[in-house]
From Swiss-Prot:
Reactions catalysed: N-acetyl-L-glutamate 5-semialdehyde + phosphate + NADP(+) = N-acetyl-L-glutamyl 5-phosphate + NADPH + H(+)
Function: Catalyzes the NADPH-dependent reduction of N-acetyl-5-glutamyl phosphate to yield N-acetyl-L-glutamate 5-semialdehyde.
Protein's recorded name: N-acetyl-gamma-glutamyl-phosphate reductase
Pfam family, one: Semialdhyde_dh
Amino acid sequence: MIKAGIIGGAGYTAGELIRLLINHPETEIVFINSTSNAGNKITDVHEGLYGECDLAFTDELPLEDIDVLFFCTAHGDTKKFMESHNIPEELKIIDLSMDYRIASPDHDFIYGLPELNRRATCTAKHVANPGCFATCIQLGLLPLAKHLMLNEDVMVNAITGSTGAGVKPGATSHFSWRNNNMSVYKAFEHQHVPEIKQSLKQLQNSFDAEIDFIPYRGDFPRGIFATLVVKTKVALEEIVRMYEEYYAKDSFVHIVDKNIDLKQVVNTNKCLIHLEKHGDKLLIISCIDNLLKGASGQAVHNMNLMFNLEETVGLRLKPSAF
């Protein structure tokens, strides 16, 4: 069994990670660290786990007793922890924050988007889990970058559920504000854009265009629905072939002929992609569950690869559908 520890156990991504790991046939949770909840039962915070988890939060860190450590911490906290603690040499780390997503000679974290860096992830000791918007958008663009087709600015509009803002209440997360409402935030300056550009340039070294990304807050709890527009004269049939070929060996990305909707991916680790051609404009529709394919599900996917397991183990999940 893979023995796992979690640091930062009280948030939405941690809750989803716990749910996945307790049902994973090859994994045992050794500890869930949360200084603010130490001593409390996991079910005091993640109430949906009644009858499934009898663990309690702890402020202890028995790193020598685990094989893999997940960070579900606020941005900046993973880096502080890594710099202030003695990490066992063989301990594998999966960081769900943004601290190590951008490549640097100062760290050895691999960018953990399996559809881009599968081989590197399989042999990695440290993996940086991609951001939720970044995952959804990149999966819509990677095949085009592979074929050197991203030579102009890309227009992206994407709407995310309220869980994307995290568990801590804020002015835009209250039900009375969020329900039956929409709003734009961080237009053209979202923090996930640099990691998107990094990945596209990895496949297409000549890529120097802009990702004109406008994020929206939606009034639903979970999921990301993105539309991307790229100019190209290549026929739709050829583009579909490129996408199907690129993702042929990936278990969680599916190219769909019919139009897609969010409920087809919510509560799954899937990404669905639909392609349309309108004159010289290629419309790419990409959707994921922000907490699963965009966070905890992808983290478990990376763990499976790092420990040489079949990539879908523990991730065959039922979509909500209705």
